[in-house]
């Protein structure tokens, strides 16, 4: 069964919409195989987003991701990665379809409520970054 990673970002955690977001995953047929609430260190955030290290937004992204707790979740199901990306909506909430997570809960392109793996290959890397195999059921 395909797995993907979701992160509920600090802005959405602060709005107290964790349950609403997780419920959308389940309603779409995705199973929560693992989840935890954590606070990223600067080192963790820089390592997780290392692919963007040379991009102009990198420092702001890292600063935002360490600004408060996040909820990291392994979602499992048929076409889990694509289904999660559809539920999230466009990166910029102003362009996200109504009813998507970002349209409903995000404030800006920076504070955009959720992260989701962008490929099956990256999903495996991202899941292994946050979870040991024994934590995923």
Curated annotation (Swiss-Prot):
<dbReference type="GO" id="GO:0046872">
    <property type="term" value="F:metal ion binding"/>
</dbReference>
<feature type="binding site">
    <location>
        <position position="57"/>
    </location>
    <ligand>
        <name>ATP</name>
    </ligand>
</feature>
<keyword id="KW-0547">Nucleotide-binding</keyword>
<dbReference type="InterPro" id="IPR001564">
    <property type="entry name" value="Nucleoside_diP_kinase"/>
</dbReference>
<dbReference type="InterPro" id="IPR036850">
    <property type="entry name" value="NDK-like_dom_sf"/>
</dbReference>
<dbReference type="InterPro" id="IPR034907">
    <property type="entry name" value="NDK-like_dom"/>
</dbReference>
<feature type="binding site">
    <location>
        <position position="91"/>
    </location>
    <ligand>
        <name>ATP</name>
    </ligand>
</feature>
<dbReference type="GO" id="GO:0006228">
    <property type="term" value="P:UTP biosynthetic process"/>
</dbReference>
<dbReference type="GO" id="GO:0006241">
    <property type="term" value="P:CTP biosynthetic process"/>
</dbReference>
<comment type="similarity">
    <text>Belongs to the NDK family.</text>
</comment>
<feature type="binding site">
    <location>
        <position position="85"/>
    </location>
    <ligand>
        <name>ATP</name>
    </ligand>
</feature>
<dbReference type="GO" id="GO:0005524">
    <property type="term" value="F:ATP binding"/>
</dbReference>
<keyword id="KW-0963">Cytoplasm</keyword>
<protein>
    <recommendedName>
        <fullName>Nucleoside diphosphate kinase</fullName>
        <ecNumber>2.7.4.6</ecNumber>
    </recommendedName>
</protein>
<keyword id="KW-0460">Magnesium</keyword>
<keyword id="KW-0418">Kinase</keyword>
<dbReference type="GO" id="GO:0006183">
    <property type="term" value="P:GTP biosynthetic process"/>
</dbReference>
<keyword id="KW-0808">Transferase</keyword>
<feature type="binding site">
    <location>
        <position position="9"/>
    </location>
    <ligand>
        <name>ATP</name>
    </ligand>
</feature>
<dbReference type="Pfam" id="PF00334">
    <property type="entry name" value="NDK"/>
</dbReference>
<dbReference type="GO" id="GO:0004550">
    <property type="term" value="F:nucleoside diphosphate kinase activity"/>
</dbReference>
<feature type="active site" description="Pros-phosphohistidine intermediate">
    <location>
        <position position="115"/>
    </location>
</feature>
<keyword id="KW-0546">Nucleotide metabolism</keyword>
<keyword id="KW-0597">Phosphoprotein</keyword>
<comment type="function">
    <text>Major role in the synthesis of nucleoside triphosphates other than ATP. The ATP gamma phosphate is transferred to the NDP beta phosphate via a ping-pong mechanism, using a phosphorylated active-site intermediate.</text>
</comment>
<comment type="subunit">
    <text>Homotetramer.</text>
</comment>
<feature type="binding site">
    <location>
        <position position="112"/>
    </location>
    <ligand>
        <name>ATP</name>
    </ligand>
</feature>
<feature type="binding site">
    <location>
        <position position="102"/>
    </location>
    <ligand>
        <name>ATP</name>
    </ligand>
</feature>
<dbReference type="GO" id="GO:0005737">
    <property type="term" value="C:cytoplasm"/>
</dbReference>
<keyword id="KW-0067">ATP-binding</keyword>
<dbReference type="InterPro" id="IPR023005">
    <property type="entry name" value="Nucleoside_diP_kinase_AS"/>
</dbReference>
<keyword id="KW-0479">Metal-binding</keyword>
């Amino acid at each position: 069964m395909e797995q993907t990673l979701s992160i509920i970002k600090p802005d959405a955690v602060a709005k107290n919409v964790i349950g609403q977001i997780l419920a959308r995953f389940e309603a779409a047929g995705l199973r929560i195989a693992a989840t935890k609430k954590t606070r990223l260190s600067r080192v963790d955030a820089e390592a997780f987003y290392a692919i963007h290290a040379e991009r102009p937004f990198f420092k702001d992204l890292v600063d935002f991701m360490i600004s408060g707790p996040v909820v990291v979740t392994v979602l499992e199901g048929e076409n889990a990665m694509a289904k999660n990306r559809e539920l999230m909506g466009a990166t910029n909430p102003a362009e996200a379809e109504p009813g998507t997570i970002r349209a409903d809960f995000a404030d800006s392109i920076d504070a955009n409520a959720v992260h989701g793996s962008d490929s099956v290959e990256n999903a495996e890397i991202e899941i292994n970054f946050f979870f040991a195999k024994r934590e995923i059921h």
